[in-house]
């Protein structure tokens, strides 16, 4: 590549030089691949992805005492009316204000947040289909009570069309309208129907017994690094 340009074609020559320099830089510039998608929720947390949940927006305090606090009320000098919090029952029930400033999250929302329980297990795994997705679960801690290990550990999965409970036994999946690791039949049945007759519902016996369906459940797993 010549670095000199002379004569009437000097302008074209300079353009060619510039193009060659740009090409050289581009060809030698390091490639920065896009980051891979997270493989699970634990990796999302580690890589600082953020998600805004539904159905309500909340303000999270991630600083105080290790973080993870859901703020349900705030007062401050935000130049609002002096009687801003002097409201009726329905206002306090539904919540009001601006979560970036002064607010009350709402008694219904506070009830939903505070009326929760959890059961945490150190081990939760199942086998492959050849082994009927047998459950292996151990190491309970939490405040919901254990409604898994004593009855459902080491049990095969059953559905309405496949009874792996006990050969010749009544189909627990058909009887209690779900799919689960039944064992003649259950002390938990989180895939059951929203019913209130005995043991027919979305059941976690150690917390709500056999007559009350849980309104909301989630089963979550993450890899232990």
Curated annotation (Swiss-Prot):
Motif Cell attachment site, chain ranges: 75-77
One Pfam family this sequence matches: Fibrinogen_C
GO molecular function, a single term: metal ion binding
GO cellular component: extracellular space
Fibrinogen C-terminal domain sequence ranges: 32-225
Keyword Nuclease in record: no
Disulfide bonds: 41-60, 172-185
PROSITE patterns associated with the record: FIBRINOGEN_C_1, FIBRINOGEN_C_2
Record keywords: Calcium, Disulfide bond, Lectin, Metal-binding, Secreted
Tissue: Expressed by the venom gland.
Annotated site residue numbers, Implicated in ligand binding: 176, 186, 198-199, 210
Domain of life of the source: Eukaryota
CDD domains per UniProt: FReD
SUPFAM superfamilies documented for this protein: Fibrinogen C-terminal domain-like (SSF56496)
Compartmental location: Secreted
Ligand binding (Ca(2+)): 164, 170
PANTHER family according to UniProt: FIBRINOGEN C-TERMINAL DOMAIN-CONTAINING PROTEIN-RELATED, FIBRINOGEN/TENASCIN/ANGIOPOEITIN
Function: Lectin involved in innate immunity.
Protein name stated in the entry: Techylectin-like protein
Protein source organism: Phoneutria nigriventer (Brazilian armed spider)
Source organism phylogeny: Eukaryota, Metazoa, Ecdysozoa, Arthropoda, Chelicerata
